[in-house]
Amino acid sequence: MILNCENMKSLMDFKHNNHQLAILNRQAPEDSNVFFSELNITPFSTSGYVSSENSLKDISKLTEEKIPSKIRKNLFFEKWLNDMSEICKMFCLFQEKDKISFWLGSERGCKRFHVDMVPYRCLVTYSGQGTELLPDNAADRNAFI
C-alpha cells in the first residue's frame, strides 16, 4: 500500500506499481524553523498553474501578493521557492504534463476525510501536521464514486 522512497527520482516508480501512497521523508534545512514558524501564523492561500518550464517564475508570481514582504525578505524564502520549483518540475515530469495545478496555504483546507478524484496528488508538508491515508480495510473506496 505504501511505497517509501529514498529520493525524488525514486518517486517516478510510483505510477508503475499498485501502491496507493508514496512517502519521501526529507531532512529540514537548519534555517527553516524560524521561517516556517513565522509563515504558519500568517493566514494565506494561493492557487494557479505552474509550468515545468517557468516553475520558479510562476510560483514567485503566485506568492507575490499573498505572502507579506517581511517573510519574503527572509533569506530562507528563496530556498523555499527553489524547492517548490524543483518539486513542481518533478511532478510535471511524473504526470507527463507541461503544467500542473498548484495550491499553497498555511491552513488545512480539509478538516475531515474525503476522496480525491484525481489520478495523482503530490502533497508536500513543510511544517506541521501532514496527511493520513486510511487503509483499505478502514474505508469504503467505492462509496463516493
Language-model features and meaning:
Residues 1-68, 75-82, 86, 90:
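N-terminal auxiliary "cap/dimerization" subdomain that precedes the catalytic jelly-roll/cupin core
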Residues 18-21, 97, 120:
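Sequence-level motif detector for i,i+2 pairs with an aromatic at +2
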Residues 22-25, 99-104, 124:
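A structural signal for short, well-ordered beta-strand segments and their strand-loop junctions
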Residues 68-107, 111, 115:
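Extracellular-facing segments of soluble proteins and assemblies that are Gly/Ser/Thr-biased and enriched
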Residues 107-145:
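Catalytic core of non-heme Fe(II) oxygenases with the double-stranded beta-helix
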